[in-house]
Regions:
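Catalytic cores of large soluble enzymes that bind and process phosphate-bearing ligands
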Residues: 12, 19, 58, 101, ...
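P-loop NTP-binding module
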Residues: 18, 30, 46-51, 55, ...
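Walker A (P-loop) phosphate-binding motif
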Residues: 29-95
């Protein structure tokens, strides 16, 4: 089988699946937009950092930059899912944490800021935020790493990153402008 044939077969299989995925996502977003599915707000401002493309947009460095600026004036915390960690539930990063316990990116953030910034992981963002507020009632701001698609939490501010590629940028700019 030639590579072109394989590509055509994959195209015919994946295209209908992408339509299904897009339809389900559209219905889900409509349900959030019309308040059928609830968005939870918290007494602490939430900053959500996310991206439009898969991987490689620099979410963690941007999160670190945002946290570095905000931590100068606010008692700041970071909450992440802890991608590829081998643990479950809410875990607060500490000096004994490993990539297996909290994930490599949350550990990187913890090592950069140390005790100045609380860094935690939890696969359930709402539970993680509640736990962070409960354990540290003096927290003034929580930054959610990689949370743009997580609509159950209503952020005060969303920072959206994307790769720079002219066709994509052009489409978005024209759509926003017109």
């Amino acid at each position: 089988m030639t590579p072109e044939t394989k590509t055509k077969i994959l195209k015919y299989i994946l295209t209908p699946l992408s339509w299904i995925y897009g339809s389900v996502t559209a219905v889900r977003n409509w349900m959030f937009d019309n308040r059928i599915l609830p968005q939870e707000e918290f007494g602490v401002p939430i900053v959500s950092v996310g991206n439009l493309t898969v991987g490689g947009t620099g979410k963690t460095p941007h999160t670190e930059y945002i946290v570095g600026m905000l931590a100068m004036d606010y008692n700041t915390a970071v909450l992440s899912r802890g991608y590829k960690r081998k643990t479950k539930g809410f875990i607060l990063a500490n000096s004994n944490s490993t990539p297996d316990s909290v994930g490599d990116e949350p550990l990187q953030i913890y090592r950069k800021f140390g005790s100045r910034v609380k860094v935690a992981v939890c696969e359930d963002r709402r539970r993680g935020i509640r736990e962070m507020i409960k354990q540290f009632p003096n927290i003034e701001l929580i930054v959610l790493d990689d949370a743009f698609q997580h609509r159950y939490v209503k952020p005060k501010v969303s920072v959206l990153l994307m790769d720079y590629s002219p066709p994509y940028i052009t489409i978005i700019c024209f759509r926003w402008a017109g």
